[in-house]
């Protein structure tokens, strides 16, 4: 991979008011590997991808992802995520119970619970508002 396209706050490009944005993200996810590019698409709510107005594009985005990193979610959000990827009951319960820094990492058929550790220097680099 020689290029990474990162989309944070993906909800801005999704939803019934922005079908073109949802199509764009789905096409990027489908075609990125062909152009030696990786795509990182970030959102806080799986419902951004599972809403009926964008479920087709949402499934395409998840179906073409090589990796998922799922941090703690509430019950409804876990249910929404279940519309996009296969989760067993143990994984669903675990995601609801995750503490800060805990996540489910999915790579193909391999799944593992991980702990994301951040150093003080890394945390300080984000400042009090999440950025510089």
Predicted regions and their residues:
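Conserved P-loop NTPase motor module
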Residues: 1, 95-132
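Conserved P-loop NTPase motor cores
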Residues: 1-94, 120
């Amino acid at each position: 991979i020689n290029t990474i396209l990162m989309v944070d706050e993906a909800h801005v490009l999704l939803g019934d008011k922005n079908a073109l944005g949802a199509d764009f993200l789905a096409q990027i996810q489908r075609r990125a590997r062909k152009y030696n590019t990786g795509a990182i698409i970030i959102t806080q709510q799986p419902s951004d991808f599972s809403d009926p107005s964008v479920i087709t594009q949402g499934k395409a985005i998840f179906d073409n992802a090589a990796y998922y990193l799922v941090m703690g979610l509430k019950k409804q959000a876990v249910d929404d995520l279940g519309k996009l990827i296969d989760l067993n009951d143990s994984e669903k319960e675990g995601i609801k119970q995750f503490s800060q820094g805990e996540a489910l990492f999915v790579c193909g058929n391999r799944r593992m619970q991980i702990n994301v550790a951040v150093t003080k220097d890394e945390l300080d680099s984000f400042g009090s508002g999440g950025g510089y």
